[in-house]
Structure formats: structure tokens, C-alpha cells
Amino acid sequence: MEQTYQYAWIIPFLPLPVPMLIGVGLLLFPTATKSLRRMWAFQSVLLLSIVMIFSMNLSIHQINSSSVYQYVWSWIINNDFSLEFGYLIDPLTSIMSILITTVGILVLIYSDNYMSHDHGYLRFFAYMSFFSTSMLGLVTSSNLIQIYIFWELVGICSYLLIGFWFTRPVAAKACQKAFVTNRVGDFGLLLGILGFYWITGSFEFRDLFQIFNNLISNNEVNFLFVTLCAVLLFAGAIAKSAQFPLHVWLPDAMEGPTPISALIHAATMVAAGIFLVARLMPLFIVIPHIMNFISLIGIITVFLGATLALAQKDIKRGLAYSTMSQLGYMMLALGMGSYRSALFHLITHAYSKALLFLGSGSVIHSMETLVGYCPKKSQNMVLMGGLTKHVPITKISFLLGTLSLCGIPPLACFWSKDEILNDSWLYSPIFAIIAWSTAGLTAFYMCRIYLLTFEGHLNVHFQNYSGKKNTPFYSISLWGKEGSKISNKNFRLVTLLKMKNGRLSFFSNKVYKIDENVRNMIQPFLSIPHFGNTKTYSYPYESDNTMLFPILILIIFTLFIGFLGIPFNQDGVNLDILSKWLTPSINLLHKNSNNSIDWYEFCKDAVFSVSIASFGIFIAFFLYKPVYSSFQNLDLINSFVKTGPKRIFYDKIKNAIYDWSYNRGYIDAFYETFLTGGMRKLAKFAHFFDRRIIDGIPNGAGLMSFFVAEVIKSVGGGRISSYLFFYFSYVSICLLSYYFFNL
């Protein structure tokens, strides 16, 4: 066992040879490296699988013994300063390492087929492997300096992958936006680290927590300064985990390839902020008001993310705002002191969201056969619908992921979200009401995404999106935005929706190439017998087996991973593996808990939460089920269609909600106007001041001297006698002036 821990330092470095060898190969042997590109995918999966097995072994030891192992090497030592590097293996590390490796392996297998057409295939796998290395290094770090180093590496990898198709201006802009937004949080994190080092004199977690607790108990710290440093530390987590107000980069990050969206949203970048707060929890709980601030940011993000997801037409952006809201739940749980439920939801959400993103990638992949490579078309849910019979496996997987995120038992997210919702009542009734209401909104917008994507008819084939004449009721399902006709057999969309500002929104006919992309369709390294799709279709078709295999594995995780944390500990039977894994665990709301539950109370709370989720699902079915369904015969529908004061009021509310969601809560516009616009004006003023004032003064003096010299030269006429005359005249004038002024 001791030997297992001693070799744990190798965990972050096992995936590292792949990006290094790819880089060297592309520099020295580019032709051979590109011709053997499938080999690199196999090596990436193999090395990450070794890390997964090693992490599972560590996790088994953690569950059985609940031990914590730390090993450090002294790097810089002198009388005033010491810096040590090492690794820390505890329950949090083992949980995160398993999460990163399992999701990472499945995403890599999926990517082998998804990215097979792309000339950036090798670059993609190099970035992905380095991403895994950075995240594994982050979770095994034993001090704040290591945390910050790997924190920045995780950010670099995410920026590279978000802007992977950098030839598309929108992708390059999204990369810049993610970089600038995270710079704010990362600068705060750096200041917070330096502040706590100034207070405690240590970067190591154990020493930091012990010294700081002693200072707090002896009242030897300035609480205002300590709170400021804690807020700065938390700012890093706010940016990385897309919490309000630094959340604006997350939906734009969907410009990257879909597999990286799955990895970022499930187990890497956005999970890093949750991990940081969980790691620093012993520090935060002894600082007044910081826990309240964390929970406040969490509950704002929960509600904001849900409302912004209500009217998104891009399937990946809708899932991105869903991630934002679910991360808010985790941050809320950490702020409440419910450490276990936060990590439980991190686990269950990771597999469910990975399933949803890979499912959406399968849908996008199939839609590209109809609309070509154009994300504005292939990702637009308005053009989808009726995909059930075309992509049945993807449909079932997406439905299970949707129901899990909605909180329907016995799927994964039900157990963790229900635990957070129940704990919220113990913390604050106001927060609880918001959290429970948002659970209904979550069910609504997730079911909306599912219905627009898979139910009804394939809208791209019809002259309007319902397949029939437009009706007032169907405009409800598209938030009052009328459909328009599709031209000729090539399915080129002329006009999609009529926007609120009265302008028509056109899809660009320009289709960007993906890094000089040609679809060579090289066969993936993993081949599983499956009904193949080798023909060109005029309808979407099911994805290849290499893409379906990870989806099927994630279905298993979504079905059963929730049982990991069911707090069943009665009659000598202890099935609560997560509580044993996290022992000892921080829980400010259940300080005397014995990790068991009252099943009557549990069932009562579960019925309430499932009822709220079911209500959201019903509303989504009512509004988004196609008009040609059985609902059209209900008198209830007719009451909505009728005009009148109530109808006008309802339309105003509906349009206000649509405007809020479609315009991203006007937060991006606010930043663009007051921050970005203000900075640009300041930059222009600084440029003017530098060129006209700072440079203008010496340049003006030089010009004055030049012109005075030219005047004197012209008066003198080029004769020495004239120069001597003027010289003596000036000297005489100066002497006379000196004489008269000194009388």
C-alpha cells in the first residue's frame, strides 16, 4: 500500500509523452507522423487508461483506510524562503482523478471518429493529452504554487481547444473572450495566494490550514484583510467555473469541437473551480462571511443560468447554460458547508453532462450530412426535430441524460441534486425556494432541448418549421418567432426566424473550412461490429460505432453512479460508499449525522422534488410538443390561441422572457458597452495623449528650434559679416538687459 502511494507522483506525467512526441514528430518527421496519426489516438487512450487503473487502486485504498498521503521535495531553501513541490493523495484527489480519467478516455475514443476528417487531428489529440496532464497535476498538487502553475496550464489548454478552429473568426473571438475573462479571476487568485503567504508564511496546505487556524483562534489577524484575500482566492474559482459575474465566456466556448465541450463541462476546466473551493474549504469555514458570499454567488448562478437557457436555439449553448446552473448548485452546496453533496453532484453531473454533449455531437454530426459544415445550421434546434427514427441510440441516450439532469429517479443527478435541495432548507428558506424553483426550470429547458431536437418532423425538409401552415400556437413553441420557407432541394436556409428587433436573421452561406479541412473519413482505431452507415443520406443517420461506444458506457454511468452516494446505513448494512470515501468530511449542516437517512423523510422530499421536475417537463411538453400532436384537440390549447387582454399580457411576459434569455440577460451587452467600450475609449485617449502631449512637447521644441534657425539663416544671407553683426548685436542686447535689470 505504501508503495502504491510512493509512485502516485507519476499520475500527471503518464499522458505527457503523447503531446511531446507529436510535437517533435511534426517538427522532424511530419509526413510519417501524419501517416501514423491513428497510433497517437491509441497511445493517448492507453496511457490515460493506465492512469485510471492506478487511480482506482488509490481510491480503493482511500475507501478502506481513509488515509491521506503527502510527499514533498524541497526545491528552493534559504533562511527567509523555502519552496517545495510534491503531491497530495486524499479522498478529493482520488475522486477527481477517477472522474478526469474515465470521462477523458471516453471523450478520446469518441474524438477518434468525430475528428477523423480534420487536418488538425494530431493537434487535437496533443492538446487533449496535455489537458489531461494539466488537470491531473492540478488535483494532485500539495501547495498553492503548484495549484497556480497547473491552473494556468489548464487554462492554456482550454483556450487552445476553444479556438481550435482559429480560422473561423467567431472561434478566435471566443478564445480571446475566455482568455480575458479568466485573466480577471486568475489575477485575483494570484493575489489571494500571495496574501495568505504573507499571513502564514507557507504555501503547503497542511501548514497553511494549521497556522491560519492558530492565528484565528488567537485573534492575531486582520479579518478585513483576510476576508479580502479569501474573496480573491474565490475569484479564481468564479472565473474558472463560470459563476456570475464571470460566466460570459462559457457559452462562447462552444465554438470548439464538441468532444472538448464535453470534457470541459464534465471533468476539467469548469470542475477546477469547484475543486479549488473544496480543497480550500478548511480555510474558508473559519473566515466570517466568506461562506455566505460563496453560497450567494452560487444561488445567483443557479437561477441566472437556468433563465438564460430557456430560449437558446443552439443545442450546445443550451447545454452550456445548463452546466452553468448546475455548477451554481455545487457552489451553493459548498457555501452551505455541505461538502459531500457538492462533490456528489460534481460526480453525477459529470457523467450526465458528458452523455448529453456527446449525444449532441452525434446529432450535429448527423445534421452535417444535410446542411454541411456550418455550426449556425447544424447546431440549430429549429432545423432539427423528428430525429427519433433516424438516430434511435442517440435519442435514447440523450433522453436518459435529460431525465437525469431533470432529477428523475433513479438516474444519477436525482440523488445528488435532491440532497442539495434538502440541505438548502436548513441553510436559508429564501435560497431553498430559489433552488427548488430552478429545479423546475431545469426540467423545462432540458425537456425543451430534447423535444425540439428529437420529436416532431425534420424541420429542415419543410417549408415551415411545423410542416404545416403557421399557427399562433406553434409560434409559442418558438417564442413568437415565425418560421420561413426553405428553398430548393439543397436545403439552403434563406431566412430562419424573425427577431424581436424587426430585422431578419440570415444564416451565412459561407461555410468555414476547418483548418484546410477535407473529409478523408479515415477509419477509427476502435472497431465494434455495428450496423454501418456507408451511404450518402438525405436524412440524418446514426453515428458510427466508435462514437456510440462511449455514449453507451456513459449511459451505464448515468444509470448507476448515483447509487455511489445513497446514504443507506441501517441494520448493519453500509452501502454509502461516498461517505466512507470522504471520511472525515466537512458538513456544517449535519454535524452529528451518522450518514444514514430517515426513509420516510427522504421519500417525502423526493416526491416533492420529482413533482416540481415533472411539472417543468409537462409545461415543456405542452409548449413544445408539435402542433400536429394529440394536444391540438384539447380545448386548453384553444384558450391559449384566442386573442384578448390575457393573451396580450401572456405574450408580453413570454417575449420579455425570450428577450432576457436570447440576449443573455443583457450582461454581455453591458460588458461590451461599459467595460470593453470604455477600455477602448481609454486606450484611444491614452494613444492621443502619448502621441500629441508626451511626444508633442519634445517634438514641438525641436520644430521651434528648426524654424528659428531657418529664420536666422535667411536673415543672415549666408555672409560672415552679417553673422558677426547679428552675433555682436545679440550680445550687446543681453549685456544691456543684464545691466539694467541689476541696477
From Swiss-Prot:
One of its GO terms (molecular function) is quinone binding. One of its GO terms (cellular component) is chloroplast thylakoid membrane. Pfam families: Proton_antipo_C (PF01010), Proton_antipo_M (PF00361), Proton_antipo_N (PF00662). Keywords: Chloroplast, Membrane, NAD, NADP, Plastid, Plastoquinone, Quinone, Thylakoid, Translocase, Transmembrane, Transmembrane helix, Transport. Its EC number is 7.1.1.-. It is a multi-pass membrane protein. It catalyses: a plastoquinone + NADH + (n+1) H(+)(in) = a plastoquinol + NAD(+) + n H(+)(out); a plastoquinone + NADPH + (n+1) H(+)(in) = a plastoquinol + NADP(+) + n H(+)(out). It is found in: Plastid, Chloroplast thylakoid membrane. NDH is composed of at least 16 different subunits, 5 of which are encoded in the nucleus. PANTHER family: NADH-UBIQUINONE OXIDOREDUCTASE CHAIN 5. This is NAD(P)H-quinone oxidoreductase subunit 5, chloroplastic. It comes from Carthamus tinctorius. The lineage of its organism: Eukaryota, Viridiplantae, Streptophyta, Embryophyta, Tracheophyta. The gene is ndhF.
